[in-house]
Regions:
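Acidic, divalent-metal-coordinating active-site segment for phosphoryl/phosphodiester hydrolysis
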Residues: 54-60
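CoA-thioester-processing core
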Residues: 1-49, 63-64, 79-83
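Hydrophobic/aromatic residues within transmembrane alpha-helices
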Residues: 4-5, 60-61, 158, 197
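Amphipathic alpha-helical blocks and their helix-capping loop/short-beta junctions
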Residues: 66-150
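Inter-helical turn/loop segments and adjacent helix faces that build the functional surface
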Residues: 48, 56, 70-73
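Long, low-complexity C-terminal extensions of enzymes
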Residues: 132-141, 147-219
C-alpha cells in the first residue's frame, strides 16, 4: 500500500492502478504515515484526498507525485530483466524506456487543481464546506456529498492530523496515528463504519453525530 511504497525512490504504476485513502468513510482516519506524506503533496491535494478518499488513477498518481513512473501492465514482467541487462544505466532511465506514452497529461485531478487548492486549503472544515458550496460545480457537489456521507468524527481527526503533519517528522506522525488508533477503534463510529462497509455492506452508516450538512463541525 501507499504507506510503504510512498517512501520508495521509484514508484511504478500501470494503467490499472487505483490509489485511495478511504478511511473517513468507515469511521477511521488515514493512517500508515498518511499524516506525514499527504500534507507534503502539492497544494491542498493531500487534504482533499485524506478527507474524501478520492480514488486516483495512474495519471493522477503521477500528477501528484505519489507515483514516479508509468509502465504498461504488459511490460511489468520485463522490468527486472531490463534492469539486469543494463546495470550501468540509472533506474529511472530504464523505467522511462519501458514507459511508452505516459498518461499524466490525462489527469482529471489536474483539471480541478485550482478549485481543490482553494476549497481544501481553507483553515477549517466549516470553511471547506462553505467554499465547496460557493463553487457550485459538479466536482464541488461530488466532494461535498462525499464529506456529508463520511463520519464527522473522522473528518475532524483527519483535518487536525493533516494540518499538523506538515510540521511533524515521520516518527512523530506515526506516533500520533498510533495513539489515535488505540482510541478510535473503540468509538461507536468506527464500529458502525466497519459494520456498514464490511459486515452488512448496506453502505448506510448511522454516525453518532449530525452530518457535515448539519453544521456541527468546527467553523
Amino acid at each position: 500500500g501507499l504507506g510503504l511504497s510512498v517512501h520508495g525512490g521509484f514508484r511504478v504504476v500501470t494503467e490499472g492502478a487505483v490509489l485511495a485513502m478511504p478511511e473517513t468513510g468507515i469511521g477511521f482516519f488515514p493512517d500508515i504515515g498518511a499524516s506525514y506524506f499527504l500534507p507534503r503533496l502539492p497544494g491542498a491535494i493531500g487534504m482533499y484526498l485524506g478527507l474524501t478518499g478520492h480514488r486516483l488513477d495512474a495519471a493522477d498518481a503521477l500528477y501528484t507525485g505519489l507515483a514516479t513512473h508509468f509502465v504498461p501492465r504488459d511490460g511489468l514482467e520485463g522490468v527486472g530483466d531490463a534492469l539486469a541487462d543494463n546495470p550501468g544505466d540509472p533506474v529511472d532511465v530504464v523505467l522511462n524506456r519501458l514507459a511508452g506514452r505516459s498518461p499524466v497529461a490525462g489527469s482529471r485531478l489536474a483539471e480541478v487543481r485550482g478549485d481543490v487548492d482553494w476549497a481544501f486549503g481553507a483553515p477549517s472544515l466549516g470553511e471547506i464546506e462553505k467554499r465547496l458550496r460557493h463553487l457550485d460545480t459538479a466536482w464541488a457537489a461530488d466532494a461535498l456529498a462525499t464529506l456529508e456521507s463520511a463520519s464527522p468524527q473522522s473528518l475532524e481527526i483527519t483535518h487536525a492530523l493533516l494540518a499538523r503533519g506538515r510540521q511533524r517528522t515521520l516518527r512523530e506522525c506515526l506516533g500520533a496515528e498510533l495513539a489515535l488508533t488505540r482510541t478510535t477503534i473503540r468509538t461507536p463510529d468506527f464500529l458502525e463504519g466497519v459494520r456498514a462497509a464490511l459486515v452488512d455492506k448496506d453502505r448506510t452508516p448511522n454516525w453518532q453525530r449530525a452530518s457535515l450538512g448539519g453544521r456541527t463541525l468546527p467553523s
